Regions:
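Conserved AdoMet/S-adenosylmethionine-binding subsite of the radical SAM
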Residues: 1-148
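A C-terminal junction/extension of Radical SAM enzymes
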Residues: 145-172
Length: 172
């Protein structure tokens, strides 16, 4: 279908692609055979074994790095931070084009310390990794949290640029 519609790539997004890993793996292998690029939009929380399997067939990944504390990850995501950081590093080391998106949530991951830790991590992996800071809007189970102030996003962008990150974007 992608070739018939003259697509240049296939992206798995909106639903975590690792939740249907076998399908994305089979599709990625077919895509590569047909000269199509492949992109994961992912939370980055997958086993190292899964990443090792998909990496040869994955051209790019946008990883939603939700915060920089394990407390944040365990309380809000019921997960852990370290596997995500390790997978970002591995993707980069494997030659996968990596971009990172951080949804900045007031009172949760927007402190100067949190933002500095995120910027430091990205810069240490590679200052050429595009970094996207996006604005939180109240919804569903977090409807009591205020939208991210634009000034907070501007501050995050400034911190990232000062750390030498070359491609820093603010969105939403």
């Amino acid at each position: 279908m992608a070739r018939a519609n003259h697509c240049k790539s296939i992206s798995w997004t909106y639903n975590e692609p690792t939740m249907w890993f076998e399908y994305t793996y089979d599709s990625a292998k077919l895509a590569q055979k047909n000269d199509l690029k492949t992109v994961y939009v992912t939370n980055g929380y997958m086993s190292s074994e899964s990443l090792d399997i998909i990496a040869p067939y994955l051209d790019a990944a946008n990883v939603d790095l939700k915060g920089m504390s394990d407390k944040f990850y365990t309380e809000l995501c019921q997960a852990h931070l370290d596997p995500v950081l390790e997978n970002i590093q591995t993707m980069h080391d494997e030659g996968i084009h990596v971009e990172i998106t951080n949804l900045v949530i007031p009172g949760y991951n927007d402190s100067v310390e949190d933002l500095q830790a995120l910027v430091k991590f990205v810069a240490e992996v590679d200052v050429n990794i595009p970094l996207h800071f996006t604005r939180f809007y109240p919804h569903y189970q977090m409807s009591d949290v205020q939208p991210t102030p634009v000034g907070t996003l501007d501050k995050a962008q400034k911190m990232a640029k000062e750390a030498g990150i070359r491609y820093v974007y603010v969105g939403n």
